[in-house]
Amino acid sequence: MDLPGPIHDILLVFLGSGLILGGLGVVLFTNPIFSAFSLGLVLVCISLFHILSNSYFVAAAQLLIYVGAVNVLIIFAVMFMNGSEYYNDFYLWTVGDGVTSLVCTSILFSLITTISDTSWYGIIWTTGSNQIIEQDLISNVQQIGIHLSTDFYLPFELISIILLVALIGAIAMARQ
């Protein structure tokens, strides 16, 4: 989206704060319904980030697939479950929880140091979608495939990982 600089920056700050607050809400709310709605806020903010970066198809796919399907499925699953069994064991802290917290915290700090130490301006994409093939000679589906495999490769892979985690979580909840 071609916006003037200050408006674009204000929208980035607003969406970033919504993303951080939604992520904190997913983790910190004890009520699973509120956590699911916070996840919906996070997914909507991510799709709005895609709109700001001019990738409208990825934004539409994010809204339709994740907000429209996965988050609604999570909300229905949480609403049909018996909530009392989760509140009884809420304050128990096991060794596995401590090890998991330690591993996740170390991964977080290593990611923060890697991101801050990397020179992002030196990264050059080797292949652009306009260098592969003439755009007039291919269909829309082929253009989407080319864009997903070149320009939007990283967001596409991250969305795939989020979907995989959602499926594993749904299977784990169904087995209990």
Curated annotation (Swiss-Prot):
Predominant location: plastid
Keyword Mitochondrion: no
GO MF annotations in UniProt: NADH dehydrogenase (ubiquinone) activity; quinone binding
GO cellular component, one term: chloroplast thylakoid membrane
TM segment ranges: 10-30, 32-52, 61-81, 92-112, 152-172
EC number: 7.1.1.-
Keywords: Chloroplast, Membrane, NAD, NADP, Plastid, Plastoquinone, Quinone, Thylakoid, Translocase, Transmembrane, Transmembrane helix, Transport
Reaction(s) catalysed (UniProt annotation): a plastoquinone + NADH + (n+1) H(+)(in) = a plastoquinol + NAD(+) + n H(+)(out); a plastoquinone + NADPH + (n+1) H(+)(in) = a plastoquinol + NADP(+) + n H(+)(out)
Coiled coil, from the record: none
Subcellular location(s) of the protein: Plastid, Chloroplast thylakoid membrane
Membrane topology according to the record: Multi-pass membrane protein
InterPro entries hit by this protein: NAD(P)H-Q_Oxidoreduct_6, NADH_UbQ/plastoQ_OxRdtase_su6, Nuo/plastoQ_OxRdtase_6_NuoJ
Family: Belongs to the complex I subunit 6 family.
Function, in words: NDH shuttles electrons from NAD(P)H:plastoquinone, via FMN and iron-sulfur (Fe-S) centers, to quinones in the photosynthetic chain and possibly in a chloroplast respiratory chain. The immediate electron acceptor for the enzyme in this species is believed to be plastoquinone. Couples the redox reaction to proton translocation, and thus conserves the redox energy in a proton gradient.
Assembly, per entry: NDH is composed of at least 16 different subunits, 5 of which are encoded in the nucleus.
Name the UniProt record assigns to this protein: NAD(P)H-quinone oxidoreductase subunit 6, chloroplastic
Species assigned in the record: Drimys granadensis
